[in-house]
């Protein structure tokens, strides 16, 4: 189990943010399309418990490589940085994983799609996201 520490900020000038990241030493990484399906269930109150269950399908826009992961996110440990416990593992086929969850009673909520540009410096990862119908974000 790992602890995920993240801060999400809505941004108005994506290009300026990307230039600033480069100026302070971040190196551009992979560029991907992520499609996130979150789930609800009658038998588990994800919202009330501040938890999340997600299947993420990823397409690397540079290589065409595809992958998928299933993730459980525990309740936030810190509301400022959205720190939470996270369990994540690869799945061979995201569509099959989604179908399994739906057949055993999990209900998908609207899919969140985003184009994500990764940036790295030392042990820090920054992502600049263009989220469909929601805008641009720095994470």
Which residues fall in each region the model found?
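N-terminal strand-loop-strand beta-hairpin
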Residues: 1-123
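Strongly charged, low-complexity linkers/loops
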Residues: 120, 125-137
């Amino acid at each position: 189990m790992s602890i995920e520490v993240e801060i999400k900020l809505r941004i108005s000038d994506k290009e300026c943010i990307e230039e600033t990241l480069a100026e302070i030493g971040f190196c551009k990484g992979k560029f991907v399309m992520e499609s996130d399906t979150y789930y609800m269930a009658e038998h588990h109150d994800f919202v009330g418990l501040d938890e999340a269950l997600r299947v993420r399908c990823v397409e690397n826009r540079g290589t065409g490589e595809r992958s998928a992961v299933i993730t459980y996110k525990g309740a936030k440990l810190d509301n400022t940085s959205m720190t939470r416990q996270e369990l994540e593992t690869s799945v061979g086929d995201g569509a099959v994983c989604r179908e399994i969850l739906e057949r055993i009673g999990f209900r998908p909520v609207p899919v969140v799609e985003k184009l994500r540009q990764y940036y790295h410096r030392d042990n820090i990862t920054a992502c600049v996201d263009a989220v469909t119908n929601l805008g641009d974000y720095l994470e």
